[in-house]
Amino acid sequence: MVSQAAKILDGKALAQKIQLSLKEEIQTLQPKIGRPPGLAVLMVGDNPASAVYVRNKEKSCTKVGMASFGRHFPGETSQSELEQVIEELNQDSRVDGILIQLPLPDHLDGIALLHQINPEKDADGLHPTNLGRLVRGEPGLRSCTPAGVMALLEEYNLEVKGKHAVVIGRSILVGKPMGLMLLEENATVTIAHSLTQNLTELTRSADILVAAAGKANLITPEMVKPGAVVIDVGINRIEDESGKARLVGDVDYEGVAEVAQYITPVPGGIGPMTVAMLLSNTVYSYRQKEAGVERQKAGGN
Protein backbone atom coordinates (compact mmCIF):
# COMPACT_ATOMS: atom_id res chain seq x y z
CA MET A 1 0.00 0.00 0.00
CA VAL A 2 1.40 3.41 -0.99
CA SER A 3 1.65 5.97 1.80
CA GLN A 4 0.94 9.19 -0.05
CA ALA A 5 -0.03 12.75 0.66
CA ALA A 6 -0.74 13.70 -2.95
CA LYS A 7 -4.26 13.70 -4.34
CA ILE A 8 -4.66 11.55 -7.44
CA LEU A 9 -5.70 13.22 -10.70
CA ASP A 10 -7.98 10.48 -11.98
CA GLY A 11 -7.71 10.50 -15.77
CA LYS A 12 -9.76 7.34 -16.10
CA ALA A 13 -12.78 8.87 -14.34
CA LEU A 14 -12.59 12.11 -16.34
CA ALA A 15 -12.17 10.19 -19.61
CA GLN A 16 -15.39 8.28 -18.85
CA LYS A 17 -17.17 11.57 -18.12
CA ILE A 18 -15.96 13.05 -21.43
CA GLN A 19 -17.00 9.93 -23.34
CA LEU A 20 -20.49 10.10 -21.84
CA SER A 21 -20.77 13.74 -22.91
CA LEU A 22 -19.58 12.85 -26.44
CA LYS A 23 -22.09 10.00 -26.63
CA GLU A 24 -24.93 12.40 -25.78
CA GLU A 25 -23.70 14.94 -28.34
CA ILE A 26 -23.48 12.26 -31.05
CA GLN A 27 -27.05 11.18 -30.29
CA THR A 28 -28.16 14.80 -30.81
CA LEU A 29 -26.16 15.40 -34.00
CA GLN A 30 -26.64 12.08 -35.79
CA PRO A 31 -30.26 12.68 -36.90
CA LYS A 32 -29.21 16.03 -38.42
CA ILE A 33 -26.08 14.73 -40.18
CA GLY A 34 -27.54 11.36 -41.14
CA ARG A 35 -24.67 9.17 -39.97
CA PRO A 36 -22.45 8.61 -36.91
CA PRO A 37 -18.98 10.16 -36.70
CA GLY A 38 -16.22 7.94 -38.13
CA LEU A 39 -12.62 7.39 -37.06
CA ALA A 40 -10.13 5.55 -39.31
CA VAL A 41 -7.11 4.01 -37.57
CA LEU A 42 -4.20 2.84 -39.74
CA MET A 43 -1.79 0.28 -38.31
CA VAL A 44 1.24 -1.10 -40.15
CA GLY A 45 3.01 -4.26 -39.00
CA ASP A 46 2.49 -6.46 -35.96
CA ASN A 47 3.64 -4.47 -32.94
CA PRO A 48 1.77 -6.14 -30.01
CA ALA A 49 1.49 -2.93 -27.96
CA SER A 50 0.10 -1.07 -30.99
CA ALA A 51 -2.47 -3.83 -31.51
CA VAL A 52 -3.67 -3.37 -27.91
CA TYR A 53 -3.89 0.42 -28.33
CA VAL A 54 -5.85 0.06 -31.57
CA ARG A 55 -8.31 -2.38 -29.97
CA ASN A 56 -8.82 0.02 -27.05
CA LYS A 57 -9.53 2.88 -29.45
CA GLU A 58 -12.03 0.77 -31.38
CA LYS A 59 -13.80 -0.21 -28.13
CA SER A 60 -13.96 3.45 -27.09
CA CYS A 61 -15.47 4.35 -30.48
CA THR A 62 -18.19 1.74 -30.02
CA LYS A 63 -18.89 2.99 -26.49
CA VAL A 64 -19.70 6.53 -27.66
CA GLY A 65 -21.58 5.49 -30.82
CA MET A 66 -18.80 6.26 -33.28
CA ALA A 67 -18.01 4.16 -36.35
CA SER A 68 -14.42 2.89 -36.46
CA PHE A 69 -12.65 1.93 -39.65
CA GLY A 70 -9.61 -0.11 -38.64
CA ARG A 71 -7.10 -0.72 -41.45
CA HIS A 72 -4.26 -3.15 -40.69
CA PHE A 73 -1.44 -3.38 -43.24
CA PRO A 74 1.51 -5.79 -43.54
CA GLY A 75 4.86 -4.49 -42.27
CA GLU A 76 6.27 -4.29 -45.81
CA THR A 77 3.51 -1.94 -47.09
CA SER A 78 5.07 0.88 -49.13
CA GLN A 79 4.91 4.62 -48.55
CA SER A 80 2.98 5.18 -51.80
CA GLU A 81 0.39 2.51 -50.91
CA LEU A 82 -0.30 4.19 -47.56
CA GLU A 83 -0.44 7.65 -49.16
CA GLN A 84 -3.07 6.29 -51.56
CA VAL A 85 -5.12 4.88 -48.65
CA ILE A 86 -4.93 8.20 -46.78
CA GLU A 87 -6.08 10.07 -49.89
CA GLU A 88 -9.08 7.72 -50.18
CA LEU A 89 -9.94 8.34 -46.51
CA ASN A 90 -9.59 12.10 -47.05
CA GLN A 91 -12.31 11.79 -49.70
CA ASP A 92 -14.51 9.37 -47.71
CA SER A 93 -17.52 11.29 -46.35
CA ARG A 94 -18.04 8.70 -43.59
CA VAL A 95 -14.65 9.49 -42.04
CA ASP A 96 -14.20 12.51 -39.76
CA GLY A 97 -10.88 11.54 -38.17
CA ILE A 98 -7.77 9.73 -39.43
CA LEU A 99 -5.11 8.37 -37.10
CA ILE A 100 -1.79 6.69 -37.95
CA GLN A 101 -0.84 4.35 -35.12
CA LEU A 102 2.80 4.79 -34.11
CA PRO A 103 5.46 3.47 -34.23
CA LEU A 104 5.74 2.78 -37.95
CA PRO A 105 8.28 0.45 -39.60
CA ASP A 106 11.62 2.18 -40.28
CA HIS A 107 11.19 2.33 -44.06
CA LEU A 108 8.13 4.59 -43.77
CA ASP A 109 8.24 8.39 -43.47
CA GLY A 110 5.68 9.11 -40.75
CA ILE A 111 5.97 12.90 -41.12
CA ALA A 112 5.17 12.72 -44.84
CA LEU A 113 2.17 10.47 -44.13
CA LEU A 114 0.93 12.89 -41.47
CA HIS A 115 1.21 15.75 -43.97
CA GLN A 116 -0.95 13.71 -46.37
CA ILE A 117 -3.92 13.75 -43.96
CA ASN A 118 -6.55 16.44 -44.56
CA PRO A 119 -5.97 18.88 -41.64
CA GLU A 120 -9.73 18.86 -40.94
CA LYS A 121 -9.54 15.07 -40.37
CA ASP A 122 -6.31 15.13 -38.34
CA ALA A 123 -7.58 13.25 -35.27
CA ASP A 124 -4.16 13.36 -33.58
CA GLY A 125 -3.89 17.15 -33.95
CA LEU A 126 -0.33 16.88 -35.30
CA HIS A 127 -0.67 18.21 -38.86
CA PRO A 128 1.40 21.39 -39.41
CA THR A 129 -1.81 23.34 -40.09
CA ASN A 130 -3.25 22.40 -36.69
CA LEU A 131 0.04 23.00 -34.88
CA GLY A 132 0.12 26.41 -36.58
CA ARG A 133 -3.39 27.14 -35.30
CA LEU A 134 -2.20 26.22 -31.81
CA VAL A 135 0.77 28.61 -32.10
CA ARG A 136 -1.60 31.39 -33.18
CA GLY A 137 -4.14 30.59 -30.45
CA GLU A 138 -6.84 29.81 -33.01
CA PRO A 139 -9.51 27.10 -32.59
CA GLY A 140 -8.67 23.76 -34.13
CA LEU A 141 -7.78 20.14 -33.55
CA ARG A 142 -5.35 19.83 -30.65
CA SER A 143 -2.63 17.26 -29.96
CA CYS A 144 -4.39 14.60 -27.88
CA THR A 145 -2.03 13.97 -24.96
CA PRO A 146 -1.34 17.65 -24.12
CA ALA A 147 -5.05 18.44 -24.56
CA GLY A 148 -5.79 15.62 -22.10
CA VAL A 149 -3.37 17.15 -19.59
CA MET A 150 -5.06 20.55 -19.90
CA ALA A 151 -8.53 19.01 -19.48
CA LEU A 152 -7.38 17.23 -16.32
CA LEU A 153 -5.94 20.44 -14.83
CA GLU A 154 -9.22 22.21 -15.61
CA GLU A 155 -11.37 19.43 -14.13
CA TYR A 156 -9.57 19.72 -10.79
CA ASN A 157 -9.64 23.56 -10.89
CA LEU A 158 -5.85 23.76 -10.79
CA GLU A 159 -4.60 27.25 -11.56
CA VAL A 160 -2.26 27.51 -14.54
CA LYS A 161 -2.14 31.30 -14.98
CA GLY A 162 1.09 32.76 -13.64
CA LYS A 163 2.46 29.38 -12.53
CA HIS A 164 5.87 28.06 -13.52
CA ALA A 165 5.33 24.97 -15.66
CA VAL A 166 8.28 22.74 -16.55
CA VAL A 167 7.80 20.26 -19.39
CA ILE A 168 10.42 17.51 -19.71
CA GLY A 169 10.53 16.41 -23.34
CA ARG A 170 10.42 18.33 -26.62
CA SER A 171 8.74 15.88 -29.00
CA ILE A 172 6.20 17.09 -31.54
CA LEU A 173 3.83 14.52 -30.04
CA VAL A 174 3.80 15.91 -26.49
CA GLY A 175 6.53 18.29 -25.34
CA LYS A 176 6.26 21.13 -27.86
CA PRO A 177 2.44 21.31 -28.05
CA MET A 178 2.27 20.89 -24.25
CA GLY A 179 4.45 23.95 -23.79
CA LEU A 180 2.30 25.95 -26.21
CA MET A 181 -0.98 24.96 -24.50
CA LEU A 182 0.37 25.92 -21.07
CA LEU A 183 1.62 29.21 -22.53
CA GLU A 184 -1.82 29.82 -24.04
CA GLU A 185 -3.22 29.60 -20.49
CA ASN A 186 -0.65 32.15 -19.30
CA ALA A 187 1.78 29.86 -17.51
CA THR A 188 5.49 30.69 -17.52
CA VAL A 189 6.88 27.71 -19.41
CA THR A 190 10.28 26.03 -19.40
CA ILE A 191 10.94 23.07 -21.71
CA ALA A 192 13.73 20.73 -20.60
CA HIS A 193 15.24 17.92 -22.66
CA SER A 194 18.11 15.43 -22.84
CA LEU A 195 20.75 18.18 -23.15
CA THR A 196 19.40 20.35 -20.32
CA GLN A 197 22.24 20.94 -17.84
CA ASN A 198 20.37 21.93 -14.66
CA LEU A 199 17.36 19.61 -14.72
CA THR A 200 16.91 19.22 -10.95
CA GLU A 201 17.20 22.97 -10.41
CA LEU A 202 14.45 23.52 -12.98
CA THR A 203 12.11 20.77 -11.78
CA ARG A 204 12.40 21.95 -8.17
CA SER A 205 11.15 25.38 -9.26
CA ALA A 206 8.09 23.95 -11.06
CA ASP A 207 4.57 24.55 -9.77
CA ILE A 208 3.40 22.23 -12.56
CA LEU A 209 5.77 19.49 -13.71
CA VAL A 210 4.96 17.51 -16.86
CA ALA A 211 7.23 14.49 -17.40
CA ALA A 212 7.24 13.31 -21.02
CA ALA A 213 10.78 12.04 -21.50
CA GLY A 214 10.06 8.32 -21.99
CA LYS A 215 12.54 7.32 -19.27
CA ALA A 216 11.31 5.14 -16.41
CA ASN A 217 11.40 6.72 -12.93
CA LEU A 218 13.42 9.73 -14.13
CA ILE A 219 11.73 12.08 -11.65
CA THR A 220 12.64 11.33 -8.04
CA PRO A 221 11.22 12.99 -4.88
CA GLU A 222 14.19 15.34 -4.40
CA MET A 223 13.55 16.77 -7.89
CA VAL A 224 10.02 17.92 -7.00
CA LYS A 225 8.92 21.13 -5.29
CA PRO A 226 6.73 20.37 -2.24
CA GLY A 227 3.09 20.99 -3.15
CA ALA A 228 3.66 20.78 -6.92
CA VAL A 229 1.27 19.32 -9.48
CA VAL A 230 3.03 16.38 -11.17
CA ILE A 231 1.73 15.07 -14.50
CA ASP A 232 3.30 11.81 -15.66
CA VAL A 233 2.94 11.30 -19.42
CA GLY A 234 5.52 8.51 -19.63
CA ILE A 235 4.54 4.92 -20.39
CA ASN A 236 7.51 2.59 -19.95
CA ARG A 237 7.41 -1.19 -19.93
CA ILE A 238 9.88 -2.65 -17.40
CA GLU A 239 10.44 -6.07 -15.87
CA ASP A 240 10.21 -6.62 -12.11
CA GLU A 241 12.44 -9.02 -10.16
CA SER A 242 10.31 -12.01 -11.17
CA GLY A 243 10.70 -11.10 -14.87
CA LYS A 244 7.08 -9.98 -15.18
CA ALA A 245 6.50 -6.88 -17.33
CA ARG A 246 4.66 -3.90 -15.88
CA LEU A 247 3.97 -0.31 -16.91
CA VAL A 248 5.57 2.60 -15.09
CA GLY A 249 5.78 6.28 -15.85
CA ASP A 250 8.64 8.77 -15.94
CA VAL A 251 7.97 9.58 -12.26
CA ASP A 252 8.92 7.55 -9.18
CA TYR A 253 5.25 7.45 -8.18
CA GLU A 254 5.51 6.19 -4.60
CA GLY A 255 8.27 8.61 -3.65
CA VAL A 256 6.96 11.69 -5.46
CA ALA A 257 3.41 11.15 -4.14
CA GLU A 258 4.76 12.01 -0.68
CA VAL A 259 6.05 15.40 -1.89
CA ALA A 260 3.58 16.59 -4.55
CA GLN A 261 0.10 17.94 -3.87
CA TYR A 262 -1.41 16.34 -7.00
CA ILE A 263 -0.13 13.48 -9.14
CA THR A 264 -1.30 11.32 -12.05
CA PRO A 265 -0.90 7.54 -11.81
CA VAL A 266 0.45 5.24 -14.54
CA PRO A 267 -1.62 3.55 -15.79
CA GLY A 268 -4.95 5.35 -15.30
CA GLY A 269 -3.79 8.95 -15.57
CA ILE A 270 -2.99 10.52 -18.93
CA GLY A 271 -3.42 7.36 -21.08
CA PRO A 272 -7.25 7.31 -20.90
CA MET A 273 -7.32 11.09 -21.42
CA THR A 274 -5.36 10.76 -24.68
CA VAL A 275 -8.01 8.40 -26.07
CA ALA A 276 -10.83 10.68 -24.84
CA MET A 277 -9.23 13.64 -26.66
CA LEU A 278 -8.85 11.55 -29.82
CA LEU A 279 -12.61 10.92 -29.76
CA SER A 280 -13.23 14.57 -28.90
CA ASN A 281 -11.18 15.72 -31.92
CA THR A 282 -13.16 13.38 -34.18
CA VAL A 283 -16.45 14.78 -32.86
CA TYR A 284 -15.07 18.32 -33.33
CA SER A 285 -14.61 17.55 -37.05
CA TYR A 286 -18.02 15.84 -37.17
CA ARG A 287 -19.61 18.94 -35.62
CA GLN A 288 -18.35 21.00 -38.56
CA LYS A 289 -20.44 18.75 -40.84
CA GLU A 290 -23.58 19.89 -39.00
CA ALA A 291 -22.63 23.50 -39.76
CA GLY A 292 -22.29 22.49 -43.43
CA VAL A 293 -25.71 20.78 -43.40
CA GLU A 294 -27.30 23.88 -41.84
CA ARG A 295 -25.68 26.13 -44.48
CA GLN A 296 -26.99 23.88 -47.26
CA LYS A 297 -30.52 24.06 -45.80
CA ALA A 298 -30.30 27.84 -45.52
CA GLY A 299 -29.09 28.10 -49.11
CA GLY A 300 -31.96 25.93 -50.33
CA ASN A 301 -34.70 28.05 -48.72
From Swiss-Prot:
Q: Which family does it belong to?
A: Belongs to the tetrahydrofolate dehydrogenase/cyclohydrolase family.
From which source organism is this entry? Gloeothece citriformis (strain PCC 7424)
The processes (GO biological process) annotated in the record are: L-histidine biosynthetic process; methionine biosynthetic process; purine nucleotide biosynthetic process; tetrahydrofolate interconversion
Name the record gives this protein: Bifunctional protein FolD
Query: What SUPFAM superfamilies would the database entry show?
Result: Aminoacid dehydrogenase-like, N-terminal domain (SSF53223), NAD(P)-binding Rossmann-fold domains (SSF51735)
According to its UniProt record, the EC number is 1.5.1.5, 3.5.4.9
Write down the PROSITE patterns for this protein, in alphabetical order: THF_DHG_CYH_2
Q: What is the top-level taxon of the source organism?
A: Bacteria
Check the record and name the InterPro entries matching this protein.
Aminoacid_DH-like_N_sf, NAD(P)-bd_dom_sf, THF_DH/CycHdrlase, THF_DH/CycHdrlase_cat_dom, THF_DH/CycHdrlase_CS, THF_DH/CycHdrlase_NAD-bd_dom
Q: In which pathway does it act?
A: One-carbon metabolism; tetrahydrofolate interconversion
**Alphabetic keyword roster:** Amino-acid biosynthesis, Histidine biosynthesis, Hydrolase, Methionine biosynthesis, Multifunctional enzyme, NADP, One-carbon metabolism, Oxidoreductase, Purine biosynthesis
Query: Molecular function terms in GO for this entry?
Result: methenyltetrahydrofolate cyclohydrolase activity; methylenetetrahydrofolate dehydrogenase (NADP+) activity
Q: What does this protein do?
A: Catalyzes the oxidation of 5,10-methylenetetrahydrofolate to 5,10-methenyltetrahydrofolate and then the hydrolysis of 5,10-methenyltetrahydrofolate to 10-formyltetrahydrofolate.
Q: Name one Pfam family in it.
A: THF_DHG_CYH
Q: Where does this protein hold NADP(+)?
A: 169-171, 194, 235
Keyword Hydrolase listed? The answer is yes
Cellular component GO terms held in the UniProt record: cytosol
Subunit comment? Homodimer.
Reaction catalysed?
A: (6R)-5,10-methylene-5,6,7,8-tetrahydrofolate + NADP(+) = (6R)-5,10-methenyltetrahydrofolate + NADPH; (6R)-5,10-methenyltetrahydrofolate + H2O = (6R)-10-formyltetrahydrofolate + H(+)
